[in-house]
Curated annotation (Swiss-Prot):
Disulfide bonds: none
Tagged with keyword Cell membrane: no
Organism this protein belongs to: Borreliella burgdorferi (strain ATCC 35210 / DSM 4680 / CIP 102532 / B31) (Borrelia burgdorferi)
Protein name: TPR repeat-containing protein BB_0298
Placement of TPR repeats on the sequence: 69-102, 183-216
SUPFAM superfamilies: TPR-like
UniProt keyword annotations, A-Z: Repeat, TPR repeat
């Protein structure tokens, strides 16, 4: 009987040891990927394994639901880097189910939706993702109204896609008040003023953009626009 109990205890010890080792290996893999900057596909698989296979122990491992939400975001970001915008949107949405006020997740859904719309050919699908992009940027700004990336993104959509020039002007003015003066911003302001029929300010901002141009392509692009305006 003593021998039987000894065998049982040894088996239990080995079983617990293997389980602990498995968890430790998973944590080690995550740390190694974070440090080494491992590829997106590898990270996605590890993050999925962490969430799906270890779901029963998730609270013990990460200590809070917020950390679980973070892994949904990380998966979304890796899909985003791969240009797989549909799955990216799915995982950012999972994050928002836990943390609906995450302005970054709303922003990334907006960018992913916008990029997805640009690659589609079916009109209804394009409109669907353009609407999702706009609503996501607006939701991001409703949570944090000074988030520059969302301000620029919604302005870009309003100038080039939705022709909401007055709304774009308001957002661009806000970015200007915040000190933005990089090339892409100045070009967008020029395009906005041109669309509003204000050629004086359009030329002013295109001229400012030309001084910020850092590549030959940028310089030639501004030059072509300026020559057509004058």
């Amino acid at each position: 009987m003593k021998i039987l109990w000894l065998i049982i205890l040894v088996n239990l010890f080995l079983s617990c040891g293997n389980e602990s080792k498995e968890k430790s290996n998973l944590g080690l893999r995550l740390r190694e990927l974070e440090i080494s900057g491992g590829g997106s596909e590898s990270k996605i698989e590890v993050y999925k394994e962490f969430i799906e296979k270890e779901d029963k122990n998730i609270l013990k491992i990460v200590n809070s639901i917020d950390k679980k939400a973070r892994f949904f975001n990380l998966i979304g970001l890796e899909f985003f880097k791969l240009g797989q915008y549909g799955p990216a949107i799915e995982y950012f949405a999972k994050n928002l189910e836990i943390n609906p006020n995450n302005y970054l997740s709303h922003f990334y859904i907006g960018v992913a939706s916008y990029n997805l719309a640009k690659n589609l050919r079916v009109k209804d699908e394009v409109e669907k993702y353009i609407i999702l992009a706009e609503n996501s940027f607006l939701k991001s700004l409703s949570i944090r109204d000074d988030f520059k990336d969302s301000l620029f993104a919604i302005s870009n959509m309003y100038v080039y896609d939705l022709d909401k020039q007055l709304e774009a002007k308001n957002y661009l003015n806000k970015l200007g008040d915040m000190g933005e003066d990089y090339f892409e911003f100045l070009m967008l302001r020029g395009a906005n003023y041109y669309s509003l029929g204000d050629l004086g300010n359009a030329i002013l901002f295109y001229d400012k953009a030309s001084k910020k141009a850092s590549t030959e392509e940028q310089k030639e692009g501004v030059s072509r626009i300026m020559s057509n305006l004058k």
